[in-house]
Regions:
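Compositionally biased amphipathic helical and low-complexity segments enriched in hydrophobic
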Residues: 11-15, 82, 141, 172
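Short secondary-structure transition/capping segments
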Residues: 8-11, 109-111, 143-149
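Solvent-exposed edge beta-strands and adjacent loop segments
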Residues: 1-73, 118-134
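Mixed-charge, glycine-accented linear interaction segment located at domain edges/termini
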Residues: 117-178
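Repeat-unit-sized solenoid/scaffold elements
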Residues: 1-2, 79, 89-106, 129-143, ...
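Structured, beta-strand-rich domain cores
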Residues: 56-114
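Acidic surface patches and DE-rich sequence motifs
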Residues: 15, 105, 147
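Short amphipathic beta-strand/extended segments with alternating polar/hydrophobic composition
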Residues: 21-26, 111-117, 154-158
Length: 178
């Protein structure tokens, strides 16, 4: 089925027993892409390939946001936000989070959720206003790694967007919707 769009990206802080707290809506997303970290190894014997092992050990995640929100940076990257001032410190440690979004695949809404992600600092890209308006986006890059049980991503299909949204909210601990 053809994919048609992506929306409603959320995250929650990964806590004890692989549960999530402090869930938040990220921002409108222009892109939400995961590239699996794959490994393929071949074993040879008797002058031929006798076995192939394919493994996936997580994914590189790229989330393109249309909004630049200091509170989101503080939570995702471990920075300190006080009275509207975001302080970046070399000792800051980003927490592990779970993050997901909803896309339309054919006639079904598909919730995608990466279970354990560590985001890194986005590039600080700025440009001057020109003759025509251009919009700039922020791209957060992260690494999704497996939990102790080996799982690193889940997907679930729904008949409605609202059902998929309720599912993601439940995963990350969002009790009121934006």
């Amino acid at each position: 089925m053809a994919k048609k769009g992506i929306r409603y990206a959320v995250f929650g802080l990964l806590g004890a027993n692989n549960t999530y707290t402090g869930g938040k809506y990220l921002a409108p997303v222009a892109a939400f892409n995961g590239t699996p970290n794959k490994s393929s190894v071949k074993d040879y014997g008797d002058d031929r390939c006798v076995e192939v092992s394919n493994e996936t050990m997580g994914a590189a995640l790229s989330v393109e946001l249309t909004n630049d929100d200091l509170e989101i940076y503080a939570m995702l990257l471990g920075h300190t936000l006080t009275e509207g001032e975001l302080v970046y410190n070399t000792d800051d440690e980003a927490p592990y989070v779970g993050t997901g979004a909803i896309g339309l695949s054919g006639k079904k809404w598909r919730a995608k959720f990466y279970k354990k992600v560590l985001f890194s600092e986005p590039n600080d890209e700025n440009s001057t206003k020109q003759e025509s308006t251009t919009f700039g986006h922020i791209t957060l890059e992260g690494e999704a790694v497996p939990l102790e049980d080996g799982s690193w991503k889940i997907e679930k299909e729904f008949d409605t967007f609202d059902a998929a949204k309720t599912y993601l909210n439940g995963l990350v601990g969002i009790t009121t919707t934006p």
